[in-house]
């Protein structure tokens, strides 16, 4: 760890003390410039903290640099930037349209966009020109036809609009028409691949016909030439995929020029552009950027086919329109624990009935501490109640993946999961309590009732955190929040995207 005395000048002291700038950011700065160049060093350290939080670029406007961090004005941040030597600037960054990008990320994004532009102009190897499916709505049929008859599509829609169902119908129709077609479905999480595998098995589609893998496993096997190219590559949970991974996926596609016409594989990306973007250095919001860059490739599903109460629908609609939502002031911890305990006691024994969601990992309102407190509170009076759990390690022999949820029966010491037989708890220890869950981990899951906790310290998030949390609920949603923090989140614009100018 870097020494505060030797590597932190008075310019950075406060932000280091507040843990806004961390040792990793100081190490990044020190790697590229001497700490004796105080202003330039400060710029690199602060910008590193912003890249680390997912901002894809910094904006220059009227000798101010946005966004900055607490305690460093935009004018001062710009002054630090001006002190950066040209050799450092040219080696690390790209400046375009008054925006500062990390060169490595900018290069990957531009390569991806170039390849997707070519793919957009190509002809599909396998098309279905006349098929209309009775199982699909008119809206879904329109998206179906456009997706199967092009080489690049973005199928976008909120929870319940039928993205996954539509993808399954596309697969069934293509296999029926072209039995030898090669199809792969990839997702950023094992939980999502497990869900798709379960749905396809209901339609008697085996992995002999369709390859289903996490993105990392798919790319790993492709790199070692353990799999051939595919005629259709379907990317599920596209809102969680970084530019870098998308670029690697596109590189697995093949194409050929036949008499001046490009014939290529088909890429379909499924996602909800309003959900949380991926976590990663300079990640931004790739799905929103793709929609902005390729609007003609974006196919939107608007109608929800999933039964959700008016309360849940009204909450999510209000959030997207940046309107105030009903909430309960965040109670003292003991009061909150008492209410949560009562809610779990009155909930049927199912891992999909109730969940507490929080954006925080650490601290009194982080899910690690909440799980510990809720567990001990319930054990005092109701030790026989089933304990909700979450898998923390992949175990393919049992069909379990990181993020899968279930429950532990205290009496029998058996673990139960919706798509798996029960497992002796003594034989499998890779799980944790799941009374409370991070909003990020909840993506792809649904619960009847959800309690969302928004404490102080969540001001760095935007409305995507609220939208994602609220849309996990099917029946009832309760928001417990610090009033000022909730207001700041609702009124705060989305984190920057590459395609749209937004200043915080």
Where are these regions (language model features)?
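Conserved ATP-binding/catalytic motifs of P-loop helicase motor domains
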Residues: 1-504
């Amino acid at each position: 760890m870097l020494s505060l005395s030797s590597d932190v000048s008075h310019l950075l002291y406060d932000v280091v003390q507040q843990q806004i700038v961390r040792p990793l950011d100081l190490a990044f700065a020190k790697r590229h410039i001497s700490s004796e160049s105080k202003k330039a060093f400060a710029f690199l350290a602060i910008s590193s903290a912003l890249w680390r939080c997912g901002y894809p670029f910094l904006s220059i406007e009227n000798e101010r640099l946005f966004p900055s961090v607490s305690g460093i004005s935009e004018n001062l941040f710009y002054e630090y930037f001006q002190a950066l030597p040209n050799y450092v600037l040219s080696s690390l960054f790209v400046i375009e349209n008054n925006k500062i990008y990390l060169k490595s990320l900018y290069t990957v994004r531009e390569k991806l966009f170039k390849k997707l532009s070519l793919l957009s102009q190509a002809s599909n190897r396998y098309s279905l020109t006349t098929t209309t499916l009775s199982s699909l709505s008119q809206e879904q049929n329109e998206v179906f036809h456009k997706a199967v008859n092009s080489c690049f599509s973005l199928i976008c829609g909120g929870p319940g609009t039928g993205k996954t169902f539509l993808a399954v119908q596309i697969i069934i129709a293509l296999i029926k028409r072209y039995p030898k077609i090669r199809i792969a479905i990839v997702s950023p999480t094992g939980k999502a691949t497990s869900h798709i595998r379960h749905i396809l098995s209901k339609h008697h589609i085996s992995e002999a016909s369709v390859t289903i893998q996490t993105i990392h496993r798919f790319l790993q096997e492709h790199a070692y030439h353990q799999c051939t190219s595919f005629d259709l590559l379907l990317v599920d949970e596209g809102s969680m995929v970084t530019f870098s991974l998308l670029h690697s996926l596109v590189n697995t596609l093949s194409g050929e020029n036949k008499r001046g016409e490009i014939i290529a594989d088909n890429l379909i990306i499924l996602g909800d552009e309003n959900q949380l973007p991926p976590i990663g250095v300079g990640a931004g919001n790739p799905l929103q950027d793709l929609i902005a860059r390729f609007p003609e490739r974006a196919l939107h599903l608007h109608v929800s086919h999933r039964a959700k109460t008016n309360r849940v629908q009204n909450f999510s609609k209000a959030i997207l329109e940046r309107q105030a939502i009903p909430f309960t002031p965040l109670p003292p911890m003991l009061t909150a624990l008492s209410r949560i305990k009562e809610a779990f006691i009155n909930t049927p024994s199912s891992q999909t009935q109730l969940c507490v969601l929080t954006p925080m990992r650490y601290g009194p309102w982080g899910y690690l501490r909440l799980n510990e407190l809720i567990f001990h509170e319930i054990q005092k009076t109701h030790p026989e109640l089933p304990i909700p759990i979450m898998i923390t390690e992949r175990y393919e022999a049992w069909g379990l993946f990181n993020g899968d949820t279930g429950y532990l029966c205290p009496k029998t010491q058996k673990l139960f999961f919706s798509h798996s037989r029960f497992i002796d708890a003594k034989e499998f220890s890779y799980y944790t309590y799941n009374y409370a869950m991070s909003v990020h981990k909840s993506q792809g899951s649904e619960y009847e009732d959800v309690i969302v906790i928004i404490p102080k310290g969540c001001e760095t998030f935007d409305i995507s955190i609220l939208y994602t949390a609220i849309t996990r609920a099917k029946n009832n949603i309760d928001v417990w929040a610090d009033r000022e923090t909730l207001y700041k989140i609702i009124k705060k614009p989305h984190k920057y995207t590459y395609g749209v100018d937004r200043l915080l």
